[in-house]
Structure formats: C-alpha cells, structure tokens
Amino acid sequence: MANIKEAILTPIFKGNPISVLVLGICSSLAVTVQLKGACVMGLSVMIVTGLSSLVCSLLRNTIPNRIRIIVQLTVVALMVILVDQVLKAYAYSVSKTLSVYIGLIITNCIVMGRIEAYALGNKPFASLMDGLGNGIGYALILIIVAFFRELLGSGTLFGYQVIPQAVFDAGYMNNGLMILPPMALILLGCIIWVQRAIQKDLQEK
C-alpha cells in the first residue's frame, strides 16, 4: 500500500514530470492559453498514461525485449486514438482547438518513460497508479500555467469574464504577452524556481 501511495504522490510533488524531470514541456507551451484546453489535455494524458502503463504491465512477461518499444508505441497509439475519438464525439470544439496536440501524446516522453521505467517491471495496479500519478502531476502544471495565462492575458477563466468591467473602465488592460508561447516558458520557469526554493533537495550542488 505504501508503494502505491508513493507511486501516486511522488510524481505530483517531488518527482513532477514537468517541473522536476523537465519532460513534456512542449505541450505546456502550446495548450495553456486557455484553462479549458489545459484541463482536457491534462486529463487526456492522465488517461493515456494510466491505461498504457496498465496494459504494458499486463503484457510485460510476453513482450520480447527486442520489440518492446514497438509494442509500447502501439499500445499508446491505441489509447490516444480512443481518447481522441471520445473527445470528437463529446467535446468537439475542444478537440478542434487542441488539434494535433492530442495526437502528439503518442510521442510524449512522460508516457513512454513511465512504461519503460516502471510498468515493465511492476504489477498492473501499481503501474496504473504510477501512470495516473504522473498524469495528475503533468495536468497540475498545465492548469497552473493556463490559469495565469488566461486570467492575465484575456481576463477570463474557462471562457467566462472574471475581471469586472469596472476594472477595465478604470484603465486596466489585458496583458497580451501572456497569450504568447514565450510567457508560458517564463511561467514554467517560475514554477520550477518556486518548487526548488521550497524543496532544497532538488537544487543542484
């Protein structure tokens, strides 16, 4: 039970795939202009990572070592296709906004990395929890970045106006820089800086 708890919690805080391992940062720059897109992308990665790790763990004793990467890619691609089809069926506008980024989950370092590093050497349930934990850690960073980008860049959250019109009438203007990709990188850098300031053991000696 302790190992299961560690598999879920470690990727969220101490071993976050984006802020600690610096993996999967491309999508954190691309899909964090709006909070809605970031939430959907985070949920998609969480589902794909969890289910892919589960399936690969179930098959771990039957996969020949020389073709394991091909099998892993096939499993991940299947999960991504399923998620993409569900989005197109039930959230078409979001699917259209995210466009190719959902498909690029197939090449996400986090998904392949957890299968290779954890799922192939551990039991199915633990692998599922590890995949979900890494997906949650990934989604958390995306949501934080998207929150500030949408709020300060557009004055909205989930598309709804949250900054009162009176504030704009007083002279406030949305920060156009926040919706540009470089600002996502700067915000991500700030998150990494804050985390390493809090967790001293993450600082390089």
Give the role of each language-model region:
Residues I63-V76, T97-G103, D130:
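Cytoplasmic-side transmembrane-helix entry/capping segments in multi-pass membrane proteins
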Residues T10, S57-N61, A126-N134:
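Short amphipathic alpha-helical coupling elements at transmembrane boundaries
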Residues E6, L128-K205:
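C-terminal transmembrane helix-loop-helix hairpin of multi-pass membrane proteins
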Residues L23-L29, V45-G50, A77-D84, I106-I110, ...:
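Hydrophobic core segments of alpha-helical transmembrane domains in multi-pass membrane transport
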